[in-house]
Amino acid sequence: ETCASSLEFTESELIIKHMYIERKMTPLNLYLQEETDEEKITRALDELGLCIKQIAMANIFPGDMLHKNFGITRHGRVIFYDYDEICLMNERNFRSLPKSDDPYAIDTLSVAPNDVFPEQFEHFIVGKRKFKDILKSLHGDLMTPEYWHEVQEKCARGDVQHFTPYNASMRFDRG
């Protein structure tokens, strides 16, 4: 279907039958490269952790969680926008890395296609050590299999959380 087929012209109106709208965002990796304000960086990394948690509580595992796959809006909200590798939470097996003194043990680890090792997330969600440390201090639970098992259990029970698009300070006071 072409664009022309979704438009209708009348004497005084242009009627758009079908339209996609995208929110303008800055890729999170570029934002973190350029931002120098520590408070804004911390807030963005907090939003990143919250975004991942909200996606998970919606029974979706985001798959490719590199920070380049997230964007930040002008209001400071972090939004996931790479849906290539998403799947349902129950389609993943969250495991702990085996404890070993052998530095080569990881090379011989048996891994099934749906296995996920949350302890590895810190190595690829964000790049710089400073960002990793901030993310771990705010959302260290994301790097544990226990957190992901808990989310899987909640999803299996049908527990649904309500998420608001803006934090409390930006919402209308209805009281």
Locations of regions flagged by a protein language model:
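Conserved ATP-binding subdomain of kinase catalytic cores across diverse folds
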Residues: E1-R43, E47, M57, P62
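Catalytic activation segment of kinase domains across protein kinase-like and atypical kinase folds
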Residues: F61-D115
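Fe(II)/2-oxoglutarate
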Residues: P62, F131-K132
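Regulatory N- and C-terminal appendages and interdomain linkers associated
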Residues: V78, A112, K132-G175
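Long, low-complexity, intrinsically disordered regions
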Residues: F117-F124
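A general structural signal for short secondary-structure boundary/capping elements
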Residues: I125-R129
